[in-house]
Regions:
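Polyanion-binding loop/helix "lid" in catalytic or ligand-binding cores
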Residues: 193-238
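N-terminal short beta-loop-beta anion/metal-coordinating cradle
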Residues: 89-125, 129
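Divalent metal-coordination and catalytic microenvironments
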Residues: 75, 110, 163, 244
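N-terminal secretory signal peptides
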Residues: 1-28
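N-terminal export leaders
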Residues: 29-44
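Accessory alpha-helical/coil subdomains and C-terminal extensions
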Residues: 242-243, 247-258
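C-terminal segment of N-terminal export signals and the immediately downstream linker at the start
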Residues: 49-84, 88-92
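Short HxH-centered metal-ligating active-site micro-motif
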Residues: 118, 122-207, 214
Length: 258
């Protein structure tokens, strides 16, 4: 969600944003009916791949990332291109679009915030069919989000889930402010506050509390996802990594959170 910080894209060498995969938590059941309904495979006469590996898209030479490490490296390379104004805007040509009409092979699920300044496909310089993105204010989880992530991992064989928070998150700021004031937010926004509240860092004050809570919230959401039994089983076998990361509006860098 938007807060009042401004962003600009910096140029210059920065630390590698994803210094290696760290698998965190495989169900083998295949939900054919769900797969068919969500992709239109029945009408098109084509099913989805059961793994995250696939041949290179038309017009590209590199194969799709098929492991957590490969996926992390691709996201890191894409973010480097983004923050240095060297974007490729890959996988947008007519041949790719025709291929994607019958199947998809995304290599990462990105659970991010709805903030308009942090679109995952741009931040990681990826194109059509590369990322499965799920976005909620403050990366808040609910049943729809859990089901969406599970679909990507269990049905499409995606090897990487990234929980992506960001600097100056408005949802986090609102949660911190509501807790301090005791105000009950209108409509469904109170749900966001209730979900973010456990991550609030009471050891800091002011903007430092908000900033620390952004990172703490990412870690909390990541740990909840990693604890999902079917995701944990895939992680245990090395087929999946669930990681937390944070996007800095002022530098445009994505950095891995331990």
């Amino acid at each position: 969600m938007n807060s009042h910080a401004t962003s600009h894209r910096g140029i210059g060498p920065e630390p590698h944003p994803f210094p290696g995969a760290r698998p965190t938590t495989d169900g083998t059941a295949r939900r054919t009916l769900l797969r068919t309904a969500l992709t239109g495979a029945a009408a098109l006469g084509a099913g989805l791949a059961a793994t995250g590996t696939a041949t290179a898209d038309p017009g590209t030479a590199a194969p799709r990332p098929g492991t957590p490490d490969e996926a992390l490296r691709e996201l890191a390379a894409g973010n480097r291109r983004w923050r240095t104004y060297r974007e490729r805007h890959p996988h947008e040509n007519p041949a790719v679009r025709r291929t994607l009409a019958t199947s998809q092979h995304p290599f990462a699920v990105v659970l991010g915030c709805i903030d308009s300044r942090v679109p995952p496909e741009l931040v990681f310089d990826q194109g059509l069919g590369d990322l499965m993105t799920v976005r909620t204010a403050g990366e808040v989880l609910d049943e729809a989000v859990l089901g969406s992530v599970a679909y990507g991992v269990l049905e499409l064989g995606i090897p990487l889930v990234v929980v992506l928070g960001h600097q100056s998150c408005g949802a986090v700021r609102a949660a911190v402010a509501a807790e301090q004031s005791g105000e009950h937010l209108p409509a469904h926004m109170q749900y966001l506050v209730d979900q973010i509240r456990p991550a609030i860092d009471h050891g800091k004050e002011g903007d430092a509390r908000i900033d620390a809570t952004v990172s703490a919230n990412v870690r909390l959401v990541r740990s909840r996802l990693a604890a999902e039994p079917e995701l944990a089983a895939r992680t245990a076998t090395g087929k999946l990594a669930v990681v937390g990361a944070r996007y800095e509006l002022t530098t445009q860098a994505v950095n891995r959170l331990a």
